[in-house]
Curated annotation (Swiss-Prot):
BP terms from Gene Ontology: catabolic process
Binding site for NAD(+): S12, G13, N14, I15, S161, V162, G163, P164, G165, T166, R167, Q168, N169, N272
GO molecular function: acetaldehyde dehydrogenase (acetylating) activity; NAD binding
Record-annotated disulphide pairs: none
Broad enzyme group: oxidoreductase
One Pfam family recorded for the sequence: AcetDehyd-dimer
Keywords: Aromatic hydrocarbons catabolism, NAD, Oxidoreductase
Catalytic activity: acetaldehyde + NAD(+) + CoA = acetyl-CoA + NADH + H(+)
Protein name as annotated: Acetaldehyde dehydrogenase
EC numbers for this chain: 1.2.1.10
Residues annotated as catalytic: C130
Family classification: Belongs to the acetaldehyde dehydrogenase family.
Length: 307
């Protein structure tokens, strides 16, 4: 049996708990700790039942055990407000931090766009936001064909899928996503909007992407690029679907997406959780494979090889 890299999950809410199930299926990652602040949280209860060590004392409850339990990677699914301190404390112990908050201390990672370009020595990687993971691949699909003057994304998510941490970070969500639309998506100017939909029954995550190209768009090349990128995202988020588009109106290119989750923790309508946690797991698998096989040529998964 192949050895695995041991991991800790910080945050026992929706994102942390959904991520737990994905890590439990990994060939190269082994979740051994879950950290929370509410001893009654469902996430901690599920983690304990799955055999993980748990603490409700926050990050300080984990620190004394990091070295003994050989934790090499930690996932922070708490809040942008506390991430900097969490990252500092764990980085000092040699742990690489995968940041699922909008804190954006480390470089952005959107797997099909820039996973292969990440610095292998980086100690903090930011997964942007759920809206960013869903939409930035589409902005990048357009910008790799021709220059994008302006990119705007609208992410609509079910209210039931949005926990208190995300609600506290709405401003950070929009700023971080807009920044990544520019830095990773390739738009000269980016804007992000999140809509929390209270509809019952809950709707699937839906995303609209608008790109304004500098020149008249090459419709055939952009359409081919978008379909190619859709296939790359589907390799780790099977429910990532192009519902309409690309639609061309002058220099404006519009793409409509729907994201259905795997239903690991919350039901399938929570595609926003799925795309975030799947992207984080995929990024960590790349890091873990490098740790386990430090050769120049590593093999993470078939999906990563095709990305």
């Amino acid at each position: 049996m192949t050895s695995k890299i041991k991991c800790a999950l910080i945050g026992s809410g929706n994102i942390g708990t959904d991520l737990l199930y994905k890590l439990m299926r990994s060939d190269v990652l082994e979740p051994v700790w879950m950290v929370g602040i509410d001893p009654e949280s469902d996430g901690l209860a599920r983690a304990k039942a799955a055999g993980l060590k748990v603490t409700a004392d926050g990050i300080n409850g984990l620190l004394p055990f990091v070295e003994a339990d050989e934790i090499k990677i930690a996932f922070d699914a708490t809040s942008a407000y506390v991430h900097a301190e969490n990252s500092r404390k764990l980085n000092e112990l040699g742990v690489v931090m995968i940041d699922l908050t909008p804190a954006a201390i480390g470089p952005f990672c959107v797997p099909p766009v820039n996973l292969s370009q990440l610095d292998e020595n980086v100690k903090n990687i930011n997964m942007v936001t759920c809206g960013g993971q869903a939409t930035i691949p589409m902005v990048a699909a357009v910008s790799r064909v021709q220059a994008v003057e302006y990119g705007e994304i609208v992410a609509t998510v079910s209210s039931r899928s949005v926990g208190p941490g995300t609600r506290q970070n709405i401003d950070e969500f929009t700023r971080t996503t807009a920044g990544a639309v520019e830095q990773i998506g390739g738009a000269e100017k980016g804007k992000a909007i999140i809509v929390i939909n209270p509809a019952e029954p809950p709707l699937l995550m839906r995303d609209t992407i608008h790109c304004l190209t500098k020149e008249q768009p090459d419709e055939q090349a952009i359409t081919a690029s978008v379909h190619e990128m859709i296939e790359q995202v589907q390799q780790y988020v099977p429910g990532y679907t192009l519902k309409n588009g690309p639609v061309f109106d002058g220099r404006k290119v519009t793409i409509f997406l729907e994201v259905e989750g795997l239903g690991d923790y919350l039901p399938k309508y929570a595609g926003n959780l799925d795309i975030m946690t799947a992207a984080a797991a995929r990024t960590a698998e790349m890091l873990a494979s490098k740790m386990l096989n430090p050769e120049p040529h590593y093999n993470v998964t078939q999906e990563a090889a095709l990305a």
